[in-house]
Amino acid sequence: MTRGNQRELARQKNMKKQSDSVKGKRRDDGLSAAARKQRDSEIMQQKQKKANEKKEEPK
């Protein structure tokens, strides 16, 4: 009983999964670099504000 085929199928499945995750991460949303930077900074400011509010919340 050899497991060669099972190993090969698992390898193919993993490669497909890896390529799909890369595709999802590197999506092009049509923004210029400056617009993307501005959008990201606004998101980070909102996250920081939310974190600060949570930190200052009385227990």
From Swiss-Prot:
It comes from Homo sapiens. GO terms for biological process: protein destabilization. GO terms for cellular component: cytosol; nucleus. Signal peptide: none annotated. Belongs to the SERF family. Pfam families: SERF-like_N (PF04419). Residues 1-59 are annotated as: Disordered. Residues 1-30, 50-59 have a biased composition (Basic and acidic residues). Positive regulator of amyloid protein aggregation and proteotoxicity. Induces conformational changes in amyloid proteins, such as HTT, driving them into compact formations preceding the formation of aggregates. This is Small EDRK-rich factor 2.
